[in-house]
């Protein structure tokens, strides 16, 4: 995963919130939606950047991943939600989908092969 030389990286959005806050969000669909959106963004970025990975979850559905995270967070309430997802992805590494075709993917993507015409300012 991408990080600085010490292994640190900035966490944005719901990923910086605690597992305890994730657990409490089960009763609030708007709050839970923020965690679900963060999870989808994390997985999309991981899929795009991790070598040999098309879908980090493999055959696991998004709802099953959320259920796994509920269990993890119940036991690790002080961990960040980002750390919980990292543990999920590490645990699923051997079951990940390595190429397109099949799987529980909700979409598809392809890395850009050419530099953009204009740099983003």
Model regions: which residues?
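C-terminal partner/receptor-binding element of secreted or periplasmic proteins
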Residues: 77-121
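Boundary at the C-terminal end of the N-terminal hydrophobic targeting segment
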Residues: 2-4
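Short N-proximal segments of mature Sec-exported proteins
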Residues: 7-71, 75
């Amino acid at each position: 995963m991408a990080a600085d030389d010490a292994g640190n990286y900035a966490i944005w959005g719901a990923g910086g919130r605690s597992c305890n806050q994730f657990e409490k969000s089960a009763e609030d669909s708007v709050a839970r939606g923020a965690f679900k959106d963060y999870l989808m963004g994390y997985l999309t970025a991981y899929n795009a950047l991790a070598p040999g990975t098309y879908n980090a979850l493999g055959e696991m559905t998004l709802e099953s991943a959320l259920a796994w995270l509920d269990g993890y967070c119940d036991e690790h309430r002080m961990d960040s939600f980002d750390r919980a997802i990292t543990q999920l992805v590490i645990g699923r590494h051997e079951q990940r989908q390595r190429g397109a075709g099949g799987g529980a993917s909700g979409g598809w993507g392809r890395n850009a092969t050419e530099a953009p015409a204009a740099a983003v300012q």
